[in-house]
């Protein structure tokens, strides 16, 4: 389904019934990373799987989006779905967004799960290394990072 949130239309999949668990994917991914697990446990919880701003089937909107803006997108989805309190889980960049959400809206959380993420944003050095790695892959193929 599509949900209008802030300045964009976001893609949201809901799987199962029960207490809501909202799961946020990492950069370059989409809601489908959670789909198999959600289907497996759909009799135990209501999984709300989003495509974050600029990923999957969601619109990009403002090209300079921030973690805080993306956390507000999550809030908008919760409000549109009438969800007062959720367990929020985030993988990689989704974890950064989940933390930003927790800082601004702790009353909306029944719990927080951070998966393969950090407690803070990447350092400038780490960002530079990530861009250098991406350039190397584009020029020489992914095998350059496997060595």
Over which residues does each language-model region extend?
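Conserved HGGG/HGGXW glycine-rich cap/lid loop of the alpha/beta-hydrolase fold
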Residues: 5-63, 67, 77
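Short beta-strand immediately N-terminal to the catalytic nucleophile in serine-hydrolase-like folds
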Residues: 70, 88-90, 115
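Conserved acidic catalytic loop of the alpha/beta-hydrolase fold
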Residues: 68-86
């Amino acid at each position: 389904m599509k949900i209008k949130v802030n300045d964009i239309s976001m893609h949201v999949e809901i799987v199962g019934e029960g207490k809501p668990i909202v799961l946020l994917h990492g950069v370059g991914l989409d809601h489908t990373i959670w789909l198999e697990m959600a289907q497996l446990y759909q009799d135990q919880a209501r999984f709300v799987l989003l495509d974050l701003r600029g990923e999957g089937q969601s619109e990009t909107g403002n090209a300079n989006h921030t973690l805080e803006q993306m956390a507000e997108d999550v809030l908008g989805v919760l409000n549109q779905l009438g969800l007062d309190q959720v367990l929020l889980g985030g993988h990689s960049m989704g974890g950064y967004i989940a933390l930003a959400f927790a800082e601004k809206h702790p009353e909306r959380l029944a719990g927080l799960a951070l998966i393969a993420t950090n407690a803070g944003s990447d350092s400038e050095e780490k960002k530079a290394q990530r861009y250098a790695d991406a350039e190397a892959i584009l020029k020489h193929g992914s095998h350059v990072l496997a060595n």
